């Protein structure tokens, strides 16, 4: 690749949490969107055509084939959510990870080998933004993620700079 060719990646994590009356995690739902962006020497920027989240991709996201656990992304993300159940937001925040973002907890590693540092941080933020909704005991957290990419190709300015914006709607 020449010095004029550029590549970038945008990772966006979504977390929904349900807290019990004591403020402990009762349920977690996670998802993530990975978007890779490339730019060539003419300034043409190409966006991906597959806008699905990791959960939406299911078996099309081939983690199970390379995982020592032989589990896909959704299974491991759900295992992480189950691990967090019963913990306070402060306990979640203190979850130790290694330099690769993976948990240092052997029990969690037996069911989830993906990097969890970003998911941990998203769950903490979701807990901080949580509002009482009067859920029944045994209620589940539900998460809907929609990605819309109206521009598959962009052209950079004369300096070959492109500005991409990620908009989130945390507060609805």
Q: How would you name each of these model-derived features?
A:
Residues 2-143, 147-172:
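Active-site- and interface-proximal helix/loop "cap" or "latch" segments in soluble metabolic
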């Amino acid at each position: 690749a020449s010095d004029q060719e550029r590549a970038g990646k945008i990772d966006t994590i979504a977390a929904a949490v349900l807290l019990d009356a004591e403020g402990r995690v009762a349920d977690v739902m996670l998802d993530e969107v990975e978007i890779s962006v490339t730019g060539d020497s003419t300034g043409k920027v190409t966006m991906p055509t597959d806008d699905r989240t990791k959960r939406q991709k299911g078996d099309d996201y081939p983690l199970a084939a390379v995982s020592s656990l032989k589990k896909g992304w959704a299974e491991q993300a759900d295992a992480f959510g189950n691990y967090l159940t019963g913990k306070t937001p402060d306990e979640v925040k203190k979850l130790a990870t290694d330099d690769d973002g993976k948990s240092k907890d052997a029990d969690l590693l037996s069911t989830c080998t993906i990097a969890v540092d970003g998911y941990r941080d998203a769950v903490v933020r979701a807990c901080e933004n949580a509002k009482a909704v009067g859920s029944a005991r045994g209620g589940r957290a539900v998460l809907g993620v929609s990605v819309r990419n109206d521009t598959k190709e962009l052209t950079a300015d004369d300096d070959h700079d492109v500005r991409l914006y990620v908009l989130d709607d945390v507060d609805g």
